[in-house]
Amino acid sequence: VGPYRVFRRLLITLLATASLAAIPLATTSQAASAGSTTPRLAAYLWAYHHTAGHPYCWGGTGPGCYDCSGVVMAAYAQEGIHFGRSTTDMLDSGRLIRETEGQARRGDLAFYGTGHVEFFVRPGHTFGALETGTLLGWHQWNAWWHPTMFFRVRGAG
């Protein structure tokens, strides 16, 4: 592995880790006491509290490492919602309701084409796993890397 790739991985990891502290989030207990927890929000909060900082690994479903669909699958499974293992399984499951970016809410799914999925956090930001050598965390979109489709999970609020 060349020095540029090592530096790039380190930089991505540092930025992802540092940016996690900048997200104002309610804890699961705070959201529950406020009476606002939907399965969608609970799945996102589970992913954030249990997987942030874990490494990405291709095909990973936890608990030590996850890939993009593995973390989404594991988080929604905590809420009793199952819709397949891969991004294409999720898209073909019949459980997803298409929505616009403006309709997306925290915990909805943001797809980058058909090959990558993350949790929608707020406009311009997602939570998930990017690629081997990075950690699960919060990501800011940019001109060349941004979701192309947004979905609410049927039955998740």
Please give the residue ranges for each predicted region.
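Extended aliphatic helical segments
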Residues: V1, V6, V71-V72, V117, ...
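Generic detector of well-ordered secondary structure
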Residues: A21-A22, M73-A74, F120, G128
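Residues that form or immediately flank small-molecule/cofactor binding pockets and catalytic motifs
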Residues: T61, E131, G155
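Short acidic-hydrophobic sequence patches enriched in Asp/Glu that either
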Residues: D67, N142-A143
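...with weaker cross-activation on analogous glycine-rich loops/strands in unrelated enzymes
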Residues: I81-N142
